[in-house]
Amino acid sequence: FMNTGLLMEAKNAGQVIGVIAHETGHIAGGHLSRIQAALDKSSAQSIAAFILGGAAAVLGQGDLAQAIIIGGQTLGTNSFLRFTRTQENSADQAAMRLLEGTHQSAQGLYEFMAILEEQELVSPQYQDAYMRTHPVTRSRMTALRAHMANSAYSRTPVAPELQAIHRRLRAKLYAFLEPTSRTMRRYKKSDRSIEARYARAVAYHKSAKLDKALKTMSGLLTEHPKDPYFLELMGQILFESGRVRDSIPYYTAAVKVAPSSALIRGELAHAQIETNNPALLQSAISNLRAA
């Protein structure tokens, strides 16, 4: 359900929280298991139409064959989308209940739906509702507006620490996914915020400017010595620059702070194995098992 594109597109932590609430609604509703049945049903309809269309073509009725095949594909698609629309509305309702129950605003979910609506390539009046991959966003937004009008938590702000985490997350993703030149334009050297320095460290690393990358990360670690993700990135920079042994203390420290992080444990195990040191092999195995 969650992916880097969504995390990059979300403009604030409230939007991510809203989407998480919505996706939790899918899980609570058992939609993951049901969606395969819907796919199977829609596929069966399309296959049946293809077989019938092939028979018509053999009989020399080409126009009829094409109509049967296209009609069958549309029927199958409509069947799947109709099922999806029901799921989406159910997940929205669950999200609103979850947010209300945890004293959080649904404003973020509403804002993210607005982003999705803006991304539609075709004006709503020209769209075929059955061909949309998402339910009619407008009706979902209307339901959310009604909820927010009656919720006691609609104006409840997102915790500042969560907003800070989201800014860091977006900065790191942007720096890894976008060209270095774009990262440096977006996170200028004059910007001394944590997220800007975080992004620049990644950009320097990608540009093989090891000294600048290490200096930037050292500064962040001086200010936040127990941040597991700063420790992890320092380890990654060293590891990917060929300094495998030097990376291990940082990965180890990161695991101590965040022992439940499977990704960090996996990175530590990888570094331990790459040293070719038999003394570290058992520790690497333990980390892989715990990951």
Which positions does each model-derived feature cover?
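Acidic/histidine metal-binding catalytic segments
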Residues: 37-40, 44, 66-68, 103-113
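Membrane-active amphipathic alpha-helices enriched in small hydrophobic residues
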Residues: 44-59, 67-79
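Short coil/turn linking the two alpha-helices of tandem helical-hairpin repeats
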Residues: 242, 274-278
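Extracytoplasmic and endomembrane cell-envelope/extracellular-matrix remodeling and assembly machinery
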Residues: 74, 78-79, 84-263, 286-289
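Active-site recognition of the HExxH zinc-binding catalytic motif
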Residues: 2, 18-31, 91
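Catalytic Zn2+-binding segment of zinc metalloproteases
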Residues: 14, 24-41, 59
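Secretory-pathway/luminal and periplasmic proteins that interact with or process carbohydrate-rich
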Residues: 27-28, 56-62, 118-125
